[in-house]
Amino acid sequence: MGDIDFQAMEFAYEKHADQNAGTAPRHQVVVVGAGPVGLTTALDLARQGVRVVVLDDDYRLSTGSRAICFSKRTLEIWDRLGVGQRMIDKGVSWNVGKVFFREQEVWRFDLLPEPGHRRPAFINLQQYYAEGYLYEQARQEPNIDLRWKNKVAGVVQADDGVDLTIDTPEGPYTCLLYTSPSPRD
């Protein structure tokens, strides 16, 4: 299977039913951002039966790399979410690190795997691959509602939760991130 060009993928804005609701729709979990942390969080919660709305103000995955090195613990979490091996297969694994000042090595560390560990200490992998693999996994998860071109523009604390104002290409809408139980029930 050839690599998907995740940098070239674009996601169309889709108007959501929440935008037509007469009262602010309620959600228990809203994740802001479809980067590595947001998608990992959404997948982990969704796998535990929690419905998650993911809002991202962009129309594409990352086109650069703000994150490029991922640790063993992150890989273990991604294993649990079904994408760990794919990340390792694509990335560059390493256990020994060296720090240089000009031509001189000033520090060296060795994080070779301990007995029973299945993953390398680190992998280097461009962020758009990490996001792409997580995105593909999230698309298969019925508990994740991923909304592109939805930007959180306002957050107001309320007695029963938090009111979010979300800007979209078709105008703003509001939803309630509620505490349980909500007095608005």
What spans do the regions from the language model cover?
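Conserved small/polar residues in nucleotide/adenosyl-binding loops
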Residues: 178-185
